[in-house]
Amino acid sequence: PSPEMKDKVSKYSVLENDYDWSIWKLKMPFDSTPYVMETQFQFNPKAKVFINYRRPVLFCSSPEWIRREKEHINNTQLWSIALLHELYHQYQYSNDAILTYVLRLYDEKKWLDMDSLQVYYLKDNLFKDSIKVENDLLEKAVAATSLDEEKKIYTQFLKVRANRQKDFLKKYKYTLVNIENFWEKLEGTSLMMEKILKENFTKVAPPPYIVEHDEMYAKNFAFNEKEKSEIQFYSELDDKRFYIGTTGYNLVQLLEKNKVAYKENLYKYASLPLDLQLKYFYKIK
């Protein structure tokens, strides 16, 4: 936390750790939400007293609290994956270009969070149907066995997406292009990081103290990313998960499949979309 945040917090204690981190434990909860695992902003000028005013702050409930609210997160390993997903968002926002772009989108009244995007997905049937077609095309492109086939499928994806975004603009008098591109980049790469972390989780030795004293640490627990359900979790749409994360993840899969050097400019050029980098790669006019 930055030094100026201290004036906005009534009481806190500093948690000791083995890393060069400054971790605060608030004496009182920041809000009344029993479960939180999210990087949050406040933009409203009336919220200047909050520590996350125009600044991304990760709010995280303890494993014990989360187990009460989310039955599927029932051990330390699962909790840590959720935490590291959000910590990766913190890393993304630590890049000046990304944070500056977020603030600019808000100031220009072009900002929507992922929850707001998901509302359109859940409530607008035509919007949702198009997203399903788009994601199916992305999955087919990932599975394609030739570059020519892949290019044809991806070209169709771009057409379907462009038509949906045009229809949205006509209907709601608001463009989604920039904000969808932004969230696909951030959430798609976070999900890819999460999946890779699960695949390599056993290579990271847990601290002996955790193994000995943490009652929620599951000693025989292991992730199996080859299970069909795990593969589907990332690549297939589910109303309970952000659609933008799924399409973003599949775009990242295509970039990785073709060894596109997208990581070099991933956060340096905040407004550069994943789908455009693939369009350049396929040389689609």
Language-model features, listed with the residues they occupy:
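Aromatic-lined carbohydrate-binding surfaces of glycoside hydrolases
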Residues: 73-77, 99-102
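Extreme N-terminal leader/anchor segments
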Residues: 1-18, 82-88
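Post-HExxH zinc-binding segment in Zn-dependent metallohydrolases
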Residues: 43, 94-172, 180-206, 217-222
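Active-site recognition of the HExxH zinc-binding catalytic motif
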Residues: 81-94, 191
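Charged, glycine/proline-rich intrinsically disordered loops and linkers
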Residues: 9-19, 26-30, 122, 131, ...
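Mature extracytoplasmic/lumenal regions of exported proteins
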Residues: 76-79, 91, 105
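Active-site scaffold of zinc-dependent metalloenzymes
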Residues: 10-76
